[in-house]
């Protein structure tokens, strides 16, 4: 039964939870250009993606806590304002160090779109319908990481990488205005003295929280590590123009959309826990194929490109199947402290994302084999965690 809470439109929710992902990937076609123009190493420039998730992790904690104390709407608006300041800093950056700092601020603000929106969804919709809504949003959000490179590739090719960051400034203003006009307050009451340490203790001693934190962190880590590596694979190895690469990302995003649609359909036959295991196994299959293919040897031909895309498609398909169910199930036992629990949980899994993307940045050596092996290790761990903790715990 649904609680009688004012719920924003699905379109607004998709925008609010999606703009942080666009901000993460919009400049990925520009990574080679940024490397050259700021006279930095490719490893250093890739850290601008990892630092984004670190800022995101701390922001999730901050805005989640604030949303419990000052309300969902004010927390969202203040976060978007900070995000806009970070976008302006990125535009004005003339060194990689300044860019790293601005990316941290940008991510800190953008994180409100993730944690507060998820809190709104969890407190306003119950049960199987909540799983279905998360699947719908996940299907729509599969486009947002791809929309970023599509816009960024075209803008970079036409106007240069600086214009990409100016585009984000414009987006931040537009989102702030739309949110100010359209977002209602959804918190039904002011919580009395929520003890953060008490909530943290509940989370720390909950084995399922650790499992869901790893699974959400690993799936996002794989996804955004791919977006960090993809420009160097497709632009430098396969000699794609930035604009073509940006459009190419939309095709890859179809895997995540199809995965979310399959997840919604599978919910009529299987429990959500089982679907998480299925998604992890599909991701592992894609990682095995991709690793075997790159170990065999890849050349910059149409056939090699097609096979690589097919294997990446399979890998991301599994992520699309698993992740909406992880997000929906993670905090079902914390409805009394959703904002604070979401803040702490989000801090944890975004630290995992940051560590995984940092690992990819550290391991980057120009070889096509590195990324698939890295993904294979993570995918195998996902299967083990899904089977041993999520599914077995549900059975018991």
Q: Over which residues does each language-model region extend?
A:
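Juxtamembrane intracellular "pre-TM" segments in multi-pass secondary transporters
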Residues: 1-3, 184-212
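Extracytoplasmic
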Residues: 8-42, 226-231
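Conserved MFS/SLC helix-loop-helix module at the cytosolic interface between two early adjacent transmembrane helices
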Residues: 58-96
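Paired small-residue
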Residues: 82, 86-89, 97-105, 306-311
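Cytoplasmic helix-loop-helix junction between adjacent transmembrane helices
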Residues: 96, 102-143
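Helix-loop-helix hairpin linking two adjacent transmembrane segments in secondary transporters
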Residues: 98, 135-180, 247
